[in-house]
Amino acid sequence: MTAILLLALQLASAQGATDETSRARALVTATDAALARGQYDDAIKNAEDAFAAHERLGRHAEAAWDLNAIGVANSYLARYPSALDAFRRALDLDRTSGSADGAITRLNNIGNVRFMQGQYSDALQQYQEALRSIDTAPAATRQRLHKMTASNLAALYQRLGADERALDYYGELSSDRTMQPAEEAQLLVNRGALYRRLGDPITALELYRSAQRLYSTSGHRDGEISAWRNIGIVYALEIGDADRAVDAFDTALRLARASSNRRGEAQALLYRGEALRRVGRSADAGRDLQAALDAAVGTGLVEEQWKALYGIGRVREATADRQGARAAYEAAIGKIESVRSDLRTIALRAEFLADKRDVYDALIWLRAAERPAPIADLFRLIEQSRARTWQDRLHADRASPSLAAVQAKLPANTWLLEYWTSAAGVARLWISHDDARIATAPAQADAETAIRDFVDVVARAGSDWQLAADAAGRALLAGLPDASDVTHLLIVPDGTLSFVPFEALRMADAAVVERFDVSYLPSAALLTRDRAAPSRWTWPWRRQLVAFGDPAPARAYPLETRPLPPLPYANEEIHRIAGELRGGADIHLGPDARKALALDGRLRAVPFVHFATHAVADTRDPERSRILLAPRDGGTQPDYLFLREIYDLDLRDVALVTLSACETERGKIVRGEGVEGFSRALLAAGASAAVTTMWDVADRPAAELMTQFYYALGRGASPAAALRQAKLTFLHSQLPWAHPYFWAGYVLTGDGSVALPRVVPWGVVAAGAVMMLAVVMVSIRAGVSAKRSTFPRRTAG
């Protein structure tokens, strides 16, 4: 009887388990259907019931996927704390049950929530952990998990402005033929955003439309909202078709509201408001933008908050509410700065401001119209909008410098000339130790053309350059006060002005180089760096120079797209330089010009470092800009000193680094940062100043100019004054080398106004030694005589 009863109980239990399993399966199906339809609250309810059923059955891996569905639904509803809680609980279950597949998915989803909240460092950390874990997943799922993670990384880098890194990931994903429709659609959307930013809106629109069709046929409501929004963005911001843009945003808004997708609703309102603003419908635009701001604040969407505030500011400015516009712009910048401060690595910050510089520009241009102009505030804003990542490397714990702090560092003979450029207009600030002035002008096509023509002319030997230099000088130097006691210019360029050799501009019938020493700065923040004053003299046995020249060639250079000619004058250049400096020299030529010798610490404690080698400025990936050195250990493979490695050098005691190579001042221009080139890396590594080149110059005149430069340095001139003297020697030579092509491309970045230690000549040392020896001998003789005078004399007894 007992056995029969036990059997009955087992059968009943099995039947109950089967019923519970069937119920859980049905709930999972209902959850998936509700998610696809955008019925997120229903999806959460079904997933919670499925989770309870799976927990009763002891199926923790399945329960983790129920929690994942709860997290996804809450993400669409912009309930980010609830989403994070669900994903974290799911991750705990995954790790308990040993589900690598589930854990990697959860890490990606936690990263996605952090991405939506604008917490990009945290998002990157989650994605990278997921990427590292993929090899622990079953072989059958690795490809899918890698696609998911790579797609998220691409979207993150795209958001941060690192378009080239994003394109690398998208290129990798595009070759995958196993994508599901929703995955393919998401890739199309992301690639479309990149093409739009790279200036190809037609291709972007085609990609968005293809994505919208894929999302629609696969029933992916959130993806379809994204596709319609991006279609509207192209019509509004690129093509200028406001009617089609508004139609697309209306569709996105209707779909978002039908599924309670609050993030989608905020974004549709935001971009519809921008479309309306662009066609002058200020009242309607203001309402949409305020509604977008309210929705973004309510859901914690920081990216949408600053964009809405920026749009509100532009609406207010258009309706003459200048105070309201200023308040909105300042609030938008506050949001941007809060996100930037959360980016914990330099790599993430590098291009973060690229698509946000417009907000700073709007506030600068608005405030520049005030009378009197608030110069101190404008200076702070301009510095805040430029070279921020470089400033972080220079002073990790400091804000952008104040006008007063910079003025306190300026000598009486120096002007700081700081430029700011935008689509609306340009500004020039000239600042001395006791004065500051500003001049503004609307953007003018004639001035921009004159500057472009000048840069083109001076970079071509034999061209007639004076007229172009006059026109560009009027565009860039108009209004510069006449002060005969000022002999040194510190220039902080902006944007493409970074490629203008100001010394070759003409003012009052003379070239700038005939009137001023000139140095360039990435930011005025460099002037606030604490540095000890150099000694006036140094001993001749102390090392003055470490130099690398004419490295032994490698068998092939796979990174280079053009042949590298020999440098027959590099050896002569370095030996002549060493002779002009007169102190000790550590010279590495041919096979000895190796990277290992540049990294072993020998650069740390010398005044001068010199490279007479080939160098390449990589405008696609600045960190891969490189100085070519000899193959290591007598091999045949090329060796490079990369830009990213230069940042890590310790050059705090180096007064001057010279890169006597082609185009070492070129580089990628990043909005909000400037030119990512060698000079910035050298200054951030601690060097006081750097000499680099804007274009290719023939080997022989390059060697001669360097000799003239170091001749002046060796006789006590400051780097800025020495470079000016070398350029004037060329300019007044009555030879073909008088053309700016041969001398204007050499630029000094850094302060460069302080004279460097002069070497005490060996003759003086010898004379001093002789004098000291004579003094010693006299002292000895005097001592002997004194001792003799104290001896008792013997007398006859």
Task: Please give the residue ranges for each predicted region.
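Short coil/turn connectors between adjacent alpha-helices in alpha-solenoid helical repeat scaffolds
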Residues: A34-D42, N74-S82, R114-D122, A155-R165, ...
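Catalytic cores of enzymes
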Residues: R380, S385, A396, S400-G797
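Eukaryotic all-alpha helical interaction scaffolds
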Residues: A34, F51-H54, N74, D94, ...
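Alpha-helical solenoid repeat scaffolds used for protein-protein interaction
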Residues: D176, Q180, I202, R213, ...
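Tetratricopeptide repeat
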Residues: A43, D49-A50, A83-A90, V113, ...
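Conserved alpha-helical positions within TPR/SEL1-like repeat arrays
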Residues: R25-A36, A61-Y76, D101-M116, R144-R159, ...
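N-terminal leader/linker segments that initiate helical-solenoid repeat arrays
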Residues: L7-D41, K45-E48, A52, R56-L57, ...
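A generic tandem-repeat structural signature
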Residues: V72-I134, A140-M148
